Design a protein with these regions (language model features):
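Catalytic loop of the DD-peptidase/beta-lactamase superfamily, centered on the K-T-G motif
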Residues: 1-126
Length: 126
């Protein structure tokens, strides 16, 4: 349980390799370990093409295979009711959305706000 401001601080700290507002919170090695895929492809039945699972975050492993985020090394996490964050180290984009919507099919909201913001920033080449 948190608020949008704290969630953004957390996401910015991850983007800045463990540092926030000039203070080291987590070592760069720990951040790098978080962002590495740790579950092999095919282990999970609901794994999305091009995506992997790091330690506490989803990671883009093959940008050509995924439609949600477009750069390798992008990472993210989303909650069941639509709260999301993602970090794109290469583009410098850090985003947080706080929502409370049931996932499809109960709601038309697709569950990942990357579907909406990626085209807005040209990530999908659309």
């Amino acid at each position: 349980v948190s608020n949008a401001e704290d969630y953004m601080r957390f996401a910015l700290m991850l983007w800045n390799e463990g540092e926030y507002n000039g203070q080291r919170i987590v070592s760069p090695d720990s951040i790098a370990l978080m962002r590495q895929p740790h579950i092999q492809t095919g282990v999970l039945s609901n794994q999305v093409d091009g995506m992997g699972f790091g330690l506490g975050v989803g990671v883009v492993m093959d940008a050509e295979k995924t439609i949600l985020l477009d750069r390798e090394s992008d990472f993210f996490w989303s909650g069941f009711y639509g709260t999301n964050f993602f970090v794109s180290p290469q583009s410098g984009l850090v985003a947080v959305i706080m929502s409370q919507n049931q996932p499809p099919p109960a709601s038309p909201w697709p569950g990942s706000f990357g579907v909406f913001i990626a085209p807005a920033f040209g990530f999908l080449g659309i």
